[in-house]
Amino acid sequence: MRFFIDTANVEDIKKAHQMGVIGGVTTNPSLVAKEGVDFHTRLREICEIVGDLSVSAEVIALDAPGMVEEGKELAAIAPNITVKVPMTPAGMEAVKQFKELGIKTNVTLIFNANQALLAARAGASYVSPFIGRLDDIGQDGLDLVETIANIFAIHGIETEIIAASVRHPVHVTKAALLGADIATVPYKVIEQMMKHPLTDKGIEQFLADWNNAQSK
């Protein structure tokens, strides 16, 4: 499994990139609005930080021609931009056109397997099932990841699965076991994934033993 960082915060992106643990970035209008910055300017900043790693940038238009126009503008910012498109009929029409133009797409707001299958057949590079939001309404988001992975494997579908709306490290571990290709996670989840009390205790013990040896 690969990891994308789900944020528009450049400091978090820098930290994750410097550790060498991410293979891309996902953003959405809410994340960019939270930063209070110009969308295109921030995308350029992100692309400068991560080089040729995938950067998903979402369109705002709701009609296919508008999505395609916006997507072309986004893709012109850098060759590694992946255009993020909502799972709607207009979105599928746009995905088909982006495929013909050679522009990668990430179909977002996937909440059932049929949506993922349709997006893949339209030509999506990635589909993003939302784990946490399904959990919020009493459904098992991880079951959806497994179902999509099984369907794609049975039919030889190459569209990659991005586990999205990841709330905690357990989501990551289980998504990896269930067949997700990628998990896109906030920086706080990356931090949580690295932590374990026995790791901290072990470091403290090593340092204590070293200092004791040096004082003799």
Swiss-Prot record:
Active site, renumbered: K84 (schiff-base intermediate with substrate)
Primary localisation category: cytoplasm
Organism: Exiguobacterium sp. (strain ATCC BAA-1283 / AT1b)
Pfam family of the protein (one): TAL_FSA
GO molecular function, one term: transaldolase activity
Localisation per UniProt entry: Cytoplasm
Catalytic reaction equation(s): D-sedoheptulose 7-phosphate + D-glyceraldehyde 3-phosphate = D-erythrose 4-phosphate + beta-D-fructose 6-phosphate
Entry's Gene Ontology BP terms: carbohydrate metabolic process; pentose-phosphate shunt
Highest rank taxon of the organism: Bacteria
Enzyme class: transferase
Enzyme Commission no: 2.2.1.2
Family from the record: Belongs to the transaldolase family. Type 3B subfamily.
The protein's role, per its UniProt record: Transaldolase is important for the balance of metabolites in the pentose-phosphate pathway.
Pathway: Carbohydrate degradation; pentose phosphate pathway; D-glyceraldehyde 3-phosphate and beta-D-fructose 6-phosphate from D-ribose 5-phosphate and D-xylulose 5-phosphate (non-oxidative stage): step 2/3
Protein name (database record): Probable transaldolase
GO CC field: cytoplasm
This protein's UniProt keywords: Cytoplasm, Pentose shunt, Schiff base, Transferase
